[in-house]
UniProtKB/Swiss-Prot annotation:
Broad enzyme group: transferase
A single cellular component GO annotation: cytosol
Positions bound to ADP-alpha-D-glucose: K18
Origin species: Rhodopseudomonas palustris (strain ATCC BAA-98 / CGA009)
Database matches in SUPFAM superfamilies: UDP-Glycosyltransferase/glycogen phosphorylase (SSF53756)
PANTHER family according to UniProt: ALPHA AMYLASE DOMAIN-CONTAINING PROTEIN (PTHR45825:SF11), GRANULE-BOUND STARCH SYNTHASE 1, CHLOROPLASTIC/AMYLOPLASTIC (PTHR45825)
Entry's family note: Belongs to the glycosyltransferase 1 family. Bacterial/plant glycogen synthase subfamily.
The UniProt record lists the keyword RNA-binding: no
The name this protein goes by in its record: Glycogen synthase
Gene name, Swiss-Prot/TrEMBL: glgA
CDD domains in UniProt: GT5_Glycogen_synthase_DULL1-like (cd03791)
Coiled-coil segments: none
One Pfam entry name: Glycos_transf_1
Cited InterPro entries: Glyco_trans_1, GS/SS, Starch_synth_cat_dom
GO terms classed as biological process: glycogen biosynthetic process
Length: 483
């Protein structure tokens, strides 16, 4: 089989830079695609963390002027990943995370910062480097939404494009006045181009102009064609439904492997699940919880936001505590929720612990030590924490939405009888339904055999990138064959 060359363009990539699940996908999918005769090179911005983490950087192109300054394109590696890094200090070398400054506000020039990434991605697809000609360009989320626009309006032929929605809530909307600085013609500003409610929509541009659209679960692909989850783009998504598909994410099962995880206190596998008790003890101590081995310990690893349903959990905490359970929460985000969980930890000492922030090692320890992992999201395109939870034997308790519905088999009567259940689902996404899920989870936890079966089923579920990579490889090959 002929090897396909794919350029993946994303604003973050693990292990170099990460703010969310996009980085995990961008970092793990290339290796899985290699087994399907797809060679991926990834283009990402030259943030300080990226420039400090790459190996053997070589300049392969220079730009005398790129949105207000000079820039270099570097070819480099990070482990087994092949990379292009856009080294543009005036755009990317600054404090804060990739999108916001230390004050928590979006950088005012984000429109230009990510237009540059998209423009260079398109240029690479059209022969910027004589020795590199990708068959497919795969762009991720709003930050790369202009990439197919740069291809379309250049007037020159280019490769096929795939645009993946990781979260429709983040749309990259900018004022019309930015158009004159983007290097796109006036005719690009139309309903069939980049125009969106009188301004410029980067995500909308990707959805409108890419050859194929994917999102990260089949259920989310269906949900976003409706008005509730479609967030103003459902009409366009319905129009392009024949070009839209949902492909579940996987996780890197080498990074997330309880049998070899150096970040957890005690390693274990499906044959030695009892060793999780040591991790639970360490986790309880880390969060200041009572050292009770028989207490049902819930873990949460999440952005603290309305989307993630963490306000509902805060409301339901008295019922969780009243049932004798404990909570270990790791997350940051909405200031009101941060304060709410910090206050809850003070109000319920020994039963609620909260670490505000993000700590990769602690996230691993929560997966290895919590009895159950709570994901009460109002919407969830795919979700990765529940996949890690399955892998680690932390029974997922999830809202029946998006990728959560696709990846967790609810312990209902039929699934329990047939021995396929892996967790607990609840619907609708309300405080009352969440409280009922606590009761169902508590009853399952009290049944030692039933709980162990949930853990075994979860730990033996294939949550790797093997199947998703096969779907992406087929998508790429089908696209190339359309020419």
């Amino acid at each position: 089989m002929t090897t396909l060359a794919v350029l993946s363009v994303a604003s973050e990539l693990f292990p170099l830079i990460k703010t969310g699940g996009l980085a995990d996908v961008a970092g793990a999918l290339p290796a899985a695609l290699r087994a399907n005769d797809v060679a991926v090179t990834s283009l990402l911005p030259g943030y300080p963390a990226v420039l400090g983490g790459i190996e053997d950087p070589q300049q392969v192109h220079s730009f005398n002027e790129l949105f207000g300054g000079t820039a270099r394109l570097l070819a480099a590696r990070c482990g087994d990943l092949d990379l292009f890094v856009l080294d543009a200090p005036h755009l990317y070398v600054r404090p804060g995370n990739p999108y916001v400054g230390p004050d928590g506000k979006d950088w005012p020039d984000n429109g230009l910062r990510f237009a540059a990434l998209a423009q260079v991605g398109a240029a690479l697809g059209q022969g910027l480097l004589p020795h590199y000609k990708p068959d497919v360009l795969h762009a991720h989320d709003w930050q790369t939404g202009l990439l197919p626009a740069y291809l379309k309006y250049s007037g020159r032929p280019g490769p096929k494009t795939v645009f993946t929605i990781h979260n429709l809530a983040f749309q990259g909307r900018f004022p019309y006045e930015l158009l004159g600085r983007l290097g796109l013609p006036e005719r690009a500003f139309g309903l069939d181009g980049i125009e969106y409610y009188g301004g410029i929509g980067y995500l909308k541009a990707g959805l409108q102009l890419a050859d194929r659209i994917t999102t990260v679960s089949p259920t989310y692909a269906a949900e976003i064609q409706g008005s509730e989850a479609g967030m103003g783009l459902d009409g366009l998504l319905r129009l392009r439904a024949d070009r839209l598909s949902g492909i579940l994410n996987g996780i890197d099962t080498d990074v997330w492997n309880p049998a070899s995880d150096a970040l957890i206190s005690a390693t274990y596998d499906v044959e030695s699940i009892a060793a999780r008790a040591r991790n639970k003890k360490v986790l309880q101590a880390r969060f200041g919880l009572k050292p009770e081995p028989g207490a049902l310990l819930y873990g949460v690893i999440s952005r603290l936001s309305w989307q993630k349903g963490l306000d509902l959990l805060l409301e339901a905490l008295p019922q969780l505590i009243g049932g004798g359970a404990q909570l270990a929460l790791l997350g940051s985000g909405d200031a009101e929720l941060e304060q709410g969980y910090a206050a809850a930890a003070r109000k319920y000492p020994g039963q609620v612990g909260a670490v505000i922030g993000y700590d990769e090692a602690l996230a691993h320890q929560i997966q290895a030590g919590a009895d159950a992992l709570l994901v009460p999201s109002r919407f969830e395109p795919c979700g990765l924490t529940q996949l890690c939870a399955l892998r680690y034997g932390a029974v997922p308790v999830v809202a029946r939405v998006g990728g959560l519905a696709d990846t967790v088999v609810d312990a209902n009567e039929m699934a329990t009888a047939t021995g396929v259940a892996t967790g607990v689902q609840f619907a609708p996404v309300t405080t009352d339904a969440l409280i009922k899920a606590f009761g169902k989870t508590r009853a399952l936890f009290a049944d030692v055999v039933a709980w162990r079966n949930l853990q075994i089923n979860g730990m033996t579920t294939d949550v790797s990138w093997k199947n998703p990579a096969q779907h992406y490889a087929k998508l790429y090959r089908d696209l190339v064959a359309e020419r």
